[in-house]
């Protein structure tokens, strides 16, 4: 039987998601309302009348020419990528009707992010690689991909070959490991079949010491409400100035709160660390099914010594665990192992949790209208 693709309602999409162990929060239908400047629709894949896959498509219209757009499925769609549930269906059986639909919608290019893991490295393997720099060994591994993985997926490699053969293209990652809109490398903690005590014991000595130091120093972590987003945002703006990135407006986070929690109360949580009656740090966490993501974080420079960031991560991990989550996701890392790289500190911080680094298949593009795609690429390049 042939697969067909058609628009489904947001409620149909949500019902599909409830039947899954998890999907990316970027594929929630309500996420489209957070993304200002994009149009959106939920697509369903059908075998006859049976819904067998779903995805959120965001359309970015060309300025002044709304009939043409870039179609984007962040960390999606949610389909049978590795032919597990439907072994008789090849990947092109799934993607061809999606491309036809997007072309009918006026898209000149489709960008997607298959949620398919390719390789994993345990924290101990990464630490061993980092140690080679400290010991000044000859030719220490500069990048994560230079280290032999503890696990790799043959099926994912096969999928990559299939996508290439069907005309999908992938932008090469730069030296930091970033070639996509969403991170290709992430750091995660497996919460399954472990007690909280065992998870805590899996942290390195520095992490455990910092969590205890925060508690002894009087750092108090609590859940915030919507009105507390203003406190989070004040610290977030300070963080942006320190780390040299452009901060999002408070209204973005208020919209994120309203949309995610409006559809599913408690999906987005705000965690606030207070020290001496002021906000020292704050974070946002998103949960979908059995997966929890650390989404945004902010911290003051003045209070860094009392380690509120470690305390916040531990608080989020505990909530994820008590909610039945199987994976706690600290999101993106660079693949650098060079201690002189300015992105190394973030890698080192996350490795201290004792989890694992995971590489995804990355984002892929399919050109539907080459002239429009080239013109849009030039426009984006000029914008910087």
Model-derived features: positions:
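Conserved, well-structured beta-alpha core segment at the onset of a catalytic domain
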Residues: 49-108
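C-terminal "cap" of GNAT-fold acetyltransferases
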Residues: 185, 189-192, 367-382
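A conserved beta-strand-loop-helix scaffold within acyl/acetyltransferase catalytic domains
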Residues: 3-66, 114-119, 168-304
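Short, high-confidence coil segments that cap the C-terminus of an alpha-helix
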Residues: 38-40, 104-107, 266, 322-325
């Amino acid at each position: 039987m042939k697969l067909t693709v058609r628009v489904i309602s947001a409620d149909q999409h949500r019902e599909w998601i409830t039947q899954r162990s998890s999907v990316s929060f970027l594929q929630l239908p309500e996420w489209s309302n957070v993304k200002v400047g994009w149009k959106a629709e939920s697509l369903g894949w059908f075998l006859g009348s049976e819904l067998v896959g779903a995805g959120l498509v965001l359309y970015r219209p060309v300025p002044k020419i709304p009939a043409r757009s870039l179609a984007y499925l962040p960390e999606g769609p949610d389909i049978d990528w590795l032919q597990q549930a439907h072994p008789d269906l090849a990947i092109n059986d799934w993607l061809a009707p999606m491309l036809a639909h997007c072309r009918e919608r006026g898209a000149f290019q489709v960008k997607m992010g298959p949620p398919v893991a390719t390789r994993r490295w345990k924290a101990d393997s990464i630490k061993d690689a980092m140690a080679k720099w400290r010991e000044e060994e000859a030719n220490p591994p500069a990048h994560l991909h230079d280290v032999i993985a503890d696990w790799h997926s043959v099926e994912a490699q096969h999928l990559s070959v299939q996508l290439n053969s069907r005309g999908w293209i992938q932008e090469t990652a730069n030296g930091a490991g970033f070639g996509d809109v969403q991170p290709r490398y992430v750091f995660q903690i497996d919460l399954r079949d472990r007690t909280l005590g065992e998870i805590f014991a899996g942290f390195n000595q520095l992490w455990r010491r910092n969590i205890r130091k925060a508690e002894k120093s009087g750092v108090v972590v609590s859940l915030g409400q919507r009105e507390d987003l203003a406190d989070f945002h004040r610290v977030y703006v300070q963080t942006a100035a320190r780390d040299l990135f452009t901060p999002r407006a408070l209204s973005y986070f208020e919209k994120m709160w309203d949309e995610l929690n409006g559809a599913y109360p408690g999906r987005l949580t705000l965690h606030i660390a207070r020290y001496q009656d002021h906000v020292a740090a704050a974070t946002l966490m998103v949960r979908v099914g059995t997966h929890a993501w650390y989404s945004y974080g902010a911290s003051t420079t003045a209070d860094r010594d009392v380690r509120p960031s470690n305390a916040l991560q531990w608080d989020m991990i505990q909530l994820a665990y008590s909610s039945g989550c199987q994976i706690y996701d600290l999101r993106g890392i660079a693949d650098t192992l060079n201690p002189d790289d300015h992105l190394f500190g973030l890698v080192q911080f996350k490795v201290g949790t004792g989890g694992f680094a995971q590489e995804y298949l990355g984002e892929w593009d399919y050109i539907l209208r080459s002239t429009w795609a080239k013109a849009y690429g030039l426009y984006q390049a000029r914008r910087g």
